[in-house]
């Protein structure tokens, strides 16, 4: 039995709102109709209303996290990851060594809690090689690797086993989009399947989107059609071999972007902006990268104005993924 306010049907919605305002509505029980009256569950007696005891059906609460239902020994629960990536309908999780034996149980719990997730993979290696891919080990759900991911109002088709993609950069991509101006020419030097390129195409006159991974370019071409954009030019190859002039350059290859910086500066128009990404240590994550930028500015005889810099996320213990935006003037 629980407490409920008894009100005529026609007054039900008005009373419900009033109970919410008073903090009295008990959402753990369902409202029940009884003849021409409603029984609205409350946490405590409310002055001015008829309060009765009633048998009401409890609202079944779905767990908020897989951690609430996963079956692992109590002494190992502290090792359970608190976050993982969801790309389209595929979840990718890093499982610590202590829990590798419970990988399938963790996968099962993720599928049960996240109804949109159809497949779960465990990271089997770090991101490696020229194509920036990693080994993925299937632990639950369907054995699929191709999906369509939605972010920032665009759709991105991709294969998580064949291309690099991080949903954690969605906010960063929107930040760059908001900085972009109408009618620009953009050079996305490491475009992947197009999360920057296709988003920026909404403002740009033209986007040159380059990647060395043929699978990335294949999906980029599909995503151009999927999003009905006609101003993105996909280019397969090393971006250092692409001779273009651009008002805005995206350099999202944190581990190696510094090796492409000289070419980026040679491609930028007067007054153009370069969005540079790198990895840096705790304490001074920007120093080495800023020094490199200034060295090349001196070499080219151009002026550099740093517009902003920020830590995007932790990459490894005491290592950060950073971004530096700078304007180049001749």
Swiss-Prot record:
It is an enzyme of class 2 (transferase). It catalyses: guanosine(37) in tRNA + S-adenosyl-L-methionine = N(1)-methylguanosine(37) in tRNA + S-adenosyl-L-homocysteine + H(+). Its main location: cytoplasm. It comes from the Archaea. S-adenosyl-L-methionine binds at residues 173, 211-212, 238-239, 252. It is found in: Cytoplasm. GO terms for molecular function: tRNA (guanine(37)-N1)-methyltransferase activity. Its EC number is 2.1.1.228. Keywords: Cytoplasm, Methyltransferase, S-adenosyl-L-methionine, Transferase, tRNA processing. The keyword Cytoplasm applies. GO terms for biological process: tRNA methylation; tRNA N1-guanine methylation. Pfam families: TRM5-TYW2_MTfase, Trm5_N, TYW2_N_2. The keyword Transport does not apply. One of its GO terms (cellular component) is cytoplasm. Gene3D superfamilies: 3.30.70.2580, Met-10+ protein-like domains, Vaccinia Virus protein VP39. Specifically methylates the N1 position of guanosine-37 in various tRNAs. Belongs to the class I-like SAM-binding methyltransferase superfamily. TRM5/TYW2 family. This is tRNA (guanine(37)-N(1))-methyltransferase Trm5b. It comes from Pyrococcus abyssi (strain GE5 / Orsay).
